[in-house]
Amino acid sequence: MKKLVVIAATCALLGSATAAWAAGDAAAGKAKSATCTACHNPDGNSTNPQYPKLAGQSADYLTKQLMEFKSGARVNAIMVGMVAPLSPQDMEDLAAFYASQQIARSAADPALAPAGQAIFRGGNLNSGVSACMACHGATGAGNPAAKFPALAGQHADYIELQLKAFRAMERANDAGQMMRQIAARMTDQEIKAVSSYIQGLQ
């Protein structure tokens, strides 16, 4: 219980932080996005569930991820090549473009949604899993100031991959190791259920 309180308090503190980067130019970002479309589609709504939807995501969060792919703080064999030629301004512009797009909504698996909702809204007190909504909001809209991503409508497969990557310590660019600590306490079934619920959030 104490760990849950600490995580929630950390979320609140980070939520008061100001954005670290200036806003980019969405029109310039659209002009620079041709390479991105192969995986993420022209409007940022990827149809391959292994690749994230970028549409509607916080610009600050997207910029942070691009910068961390480039610095090596976040590791992905495909993205490291994609970000290599990008300047900080390019990253801000691309982030602004995708943030300006509308995410395409999807449906949750009705067999998994109830268990997923329980984890998303209440966590698991017995195992110390914090409620997802503590940092990502009740509707999954995220917290742009803290660079906590919007989750609603994201591919369930992608969410599941990322939670398992955090759990395996293969992804390590989360603030204060929060996601690694939470994912480490989650079962495969909890991960699958909450990922499906998130996909169906409107």
Feature annotation, model-predicted:
Residues 1-21:
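Gram-negative bacterial Sec-dependent N-terminal signal peptides
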Residues 16-33, 47-50, 100-126:
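Electrostatic cytochrome c docking/interface patches
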Residues 20, 26, 30-71:
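The feature marks the first
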Residues 27-34, 59, 121-133, 152-161:
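Sequence context surrounding c-type heme c attachment/ligation sites in exported
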Residues 36-42, 94, 129-138, 194:
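The canonical Cys-X-X-Cys-His
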Residues 47-53, 67-111, 144-150, 167-201:
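Axial heme c-ligation environment in periplasmic c-type cytochrome domains
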